[in-house]
């Protein structure tokens, strides 16, 4: 009888441990989602100039007279198997104090040369934004690049995360030492955001991506750190296809 009681108690204890561990995982997943919620709930912002009237997370690191600066970055990276890695994207700095926006479009080609050491060759094309239109500030002779800039749209302009709460059973990571955190979800090709990316980019794989939400800083909010989203289609040693996006709010003196 004593053995039976010990066995029952052992099973109950094990069940409690599993339940508590699972509960902690679910709780942390909810915290990670919530930390991204304020930013992702803003998507889509079709007219980027609306950000002049939107305020991000402020803390005592901000000067009271500083309205802050939004930093937008969208990038598509494609490296077919054993070929060069090509990254194309754009960064904009939207100063809410002066209501002016400048940044650059970039093309970065990374090649494996000199005994496998990677060499990148990034070219930047300065731009500004006027009336929600991206305009090069210097002459560009390459017609292909001019067209890419003219047609460029940031993910924040067409992405939509109203169904974020429906993403379940994510792979959650949290390091309180840094602090850093992430949540990874397997998507399908029927996902709205995946369809939007395939509509705008020539993505050379039929594989459905994983969505990665990753950030650093206090989970409850901080002007220090970052929050990035990434759609990873392929991730191998010599083959990579992924799209990354970020919308950050920083002190104007930091950018």
Swiss-Prot record:
Paired cysteines (S-S): none
Membrane topology per record: Lipid-anchor
Location relative to the cell: Cell membrane
Key words, A-Z: Cell membrane, Lipoprotein, Membrane, Palmitate, Signal
Any one GO CC term of the record: plasma membrane
Lipidation (N-palmitoyl cysteine): 24
Predominant location: membrane
Lipid attachment site numbers (S-diacylglycerol cysteine): 24
Signal peptide per UniProt: 1-23
Pfam families, per the entry: DUF576
Residues spanning the membrane: none
Similarity field: Belongs to the staphylococcal tandem lipoprotein family.
NCBIfam families: SA_tandem_lipo (TIGR01742)
Protein name: Uncharacterized lipoprotein SAOUHSC_00052
């Amino acid at each position: 009888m004593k053995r039976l009681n010990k066995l029952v108690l052992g099973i109950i204890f094990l069940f409690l441990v599993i339940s508590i561990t699972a509960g902690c995982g679910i709780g942390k997943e909810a915290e990670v989602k919530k930390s991204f919620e304020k930013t992702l709930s803003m998507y889509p912002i079709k007219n980027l100039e609306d950000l002049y009237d939107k305020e991000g997370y402020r803390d005592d690191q901000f000067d009271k007279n500083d309205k802050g600066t939004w930093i937008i970055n969208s990038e598509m990276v494609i490296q077919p198997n054993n070929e060069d890695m090509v990254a194309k994207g754009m960064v904009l700095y939207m100063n809410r104090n002066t209501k002016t926006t400048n940044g650059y479009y970039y093309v970065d080609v990374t090649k494996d040369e000199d005994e496998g050491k990677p060499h990148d060759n990034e070219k930047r094309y300065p731009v500004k934004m006027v009336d929600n239109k991206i305009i090069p500030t210097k002459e560009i002779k390459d017609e292909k690049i001019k067209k890419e800039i003219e047609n460029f749209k940031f993910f924040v302009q067409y992405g939509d995360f109203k169904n974020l709460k429906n993403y379940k059973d994510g792979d959650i990571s949290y390091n309180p030492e840094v602090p850093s955190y992430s949540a990874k979800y397997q998507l399908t090709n029927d996902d709205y955001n995946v369809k939007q990316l395939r509509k705008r980019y020539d993505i050379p794989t039929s594989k459905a991506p994983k969505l990665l939400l990753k950030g650093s800083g206090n989970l409850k909010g901080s002007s220090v750190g970052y929050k990035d989203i990434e759609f990873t289609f392929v991730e191998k040693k010599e083959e990579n296809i992924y799209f990354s996006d970020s919308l950050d709010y920083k002190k104007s003196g930091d950018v």
